[in-house]
């Protein structure tokens, strides 16, 4: 005999959501600290803040997908959120690492905007191919889960797929563009 509970009281659901949010906030703080430290030579704190803002966008996409699917905010929800944090920050770190490498190669010959643009162009192909490969696997999971009525798999794979698509966009376009805009604004205030 297998015991299964699928209904959760409002109080339990609220506690779970609170604990989930604490886990996500904790992960975001650690990510900010990591980026600030690892990329301190090229303005890591600002880059970290922009990366966290981009991650928040990705998390909102995952949350919105759960809402549109009317899926319960359960273990699949927090697993999808934390997985997207990992995938998206990995893509962002690859781009930031390329920015750091190119700063060492180009020195001050290129403006920060040119440096970031060059670095994004260099890492875009790798980031897009990695994401497309993973999204294809998630797409297969979605199709199979729908064919066999595996709702728990679908409510994990589909939001994850949407979050990954958002993540590739935010890693290549949002975090880097915001970093450039913030840096230019900061430099304009100095002058």
Predicted regions and their residues:
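A structural signal for conserved, well-ordered secondary-structure elements
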Residues: 1-191
